[in-house]
Design a protein with these regions (language model features):
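A structural signal for short, well-ordered beta-strand segments
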Residues: 22-24, 92-94, 164, 242, ...
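Short beta-strand segments enriched in hydrophobic/aromatic residues
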Residues: 28, 96, 246, 300-302
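Secondary-structure boundary elements
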Residues: 111-117, 121-194, 202, 210, ...
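A short, structural micro-pattern
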Residues: 18, 33, 50, 84-88, ...
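Intrinsically disordered, low-complexity N-terminal segments that are enriched in acidic
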Residues: 1-117
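Alpha-helix N-cap/helix-initiation motif
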Residues: 13, 189-193, 231
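Hydrophobic/aromatic-rich core segments of domains that either
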Residues: 2-5, 166, 198-286, 293
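Short hairpin/turn module used for nucleic-acid contact or packing/dimerization
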Residues: 13, 277-319
Length: 319
């Protein structure tokens, strides 16, 4: 592994095309009379990501459903199932095309200039919102100390972000099941372990601790099996990373879990201030059931040969 801040230059990739299938199945030990759900499972249409098709299906068929766009521009789907059921399945299928990382962004004056110049002071309110701490507060003394080691005076923003990405990847252990959705950043900092959404939230707390604007991004990561092994359908998972704002309304996305800048292997679904703004699926049920089980299957399948051949990466088990 390279020393912090000394990574090799990013090599331009090629356009990738994927078929993404995300299936969530709930089973209950008693009949559910009514289920309400809201999900963020539709990839965003972006300048570097084109959504060729996307649909969300629910079984049993909902009695009521609608789609909309939230305050951050994310597509969401709402549904209400009133048919009595003991299992509920939500499946999202999309075909997306993703461009390589923008070399112009990496070579921009903002990316190569002092990080202090990327603070959003005096800019529009929506951007400033991403620089504010959450409630309850996530910026602790430990976060400030960790961020101060990275964001030294006058350091180029890109260099600092690459260093932060590498430090989190090095200092924290990826351990599936070690945290829950409700786990606080302070706990992750103390334990030095977690999964992708934890590492993204640590990165965001560090950005905000020094006055930078950062957003939480949910999506998928195309993964490759070990050499000699066949690709297992459904073995992928939801993923999460962070992005920092640059003047000119541009964002530089980075993936601490895999120690890399976000590129054509990442499929962006939604973004917000934190995980709570964009959970893949959230809902309420009415039942006498005392227990339930959730099974999640995610498959990010390359549609053409050019989309395979990427090194093994880690995605999260956050559902």
């Amino acid at each position: 592994m390279s020393a912090p801040g000394q990574h090799s230059p990013v090599v331009a990739g090629t356009v990738r095309r994927y078929r993404v299938t995300h299936t969530t199945r709930y089973t209950y030990d008693d009949v559910v009379s009514s289920s309400y759900g809201r999900c963020y499972l539709t990839p965003r249409a972006l300048s570097d990501q084109r959504v060729e098709s996307s649909q969300v299906s629910v079984d049993p068929e909902p009695d009521d459903r609608s789609t909309g766009v939230d305050v951050y521009g994310n597509s969401d789907t709402y549904f209400h199932v009133r048919t009595p059921h003991d299992a509920l399945t939500v499946t999202a299928e999309s075909v997306v095309e993703v461009d390589p990382i923008d070399q112009g962004l990496l070579l921009s004056a903002a990316a190569l200039g002092p990080w202090e110049e990327c603070r959003p002071a005096g800019t529009s309110a929506p951007v400033v919102e991403f620089a504010m701490d959450l409630y309850p507060a996530e910026i602790t003394d430990a976060v400030r100390e960790y961020a101060a080691e990275v964001f030294t005076p006058g350091r180029p923003l890109l260099e600092a972000i690459v260093d932060l990405t590498n430090r989190i990847n090095t200092d924290f252990t990826y351990r599936s099941g070690s945290t829950a959705i409700s786990t606080r950043v302070a706990t992750v900092m103390a334990r030095r372990e977690g999964v992708c959404q934890d590492f993204a939230r640590v990165a965001l707390a560090c950005l905000r601790a020094v006055g930078l604007a950062g957003r939480y991004v949910s999506g998928y990561l195309a993964t490759e099996p070990p050499p000699g092994r066949e690709r297992v359908v459904g073995a992928d998972a939801s993923h999460a990373w962070a992005a920092v704002w640059l003047p000119g309304e541009r964002w530089l996305a980075f993936d601490p879990t895999n120690d890399k800048l976000v590129d054509e292997r990442h499929v962006t679904v939604a973004w917000g201030r934190d995980y709570d703004d964009v959970p893949p699926l959230r809902g309420v049920i009415y039942t006498e059931s005392s227990s339930s089980r959730i099974e999640v299957s995610v498959d990010v399948a390359p549609i053409d040969p050019a989309a395979s051949g990427n090194p093994a990466n880690r995605a999260s088990d956050a559902h």
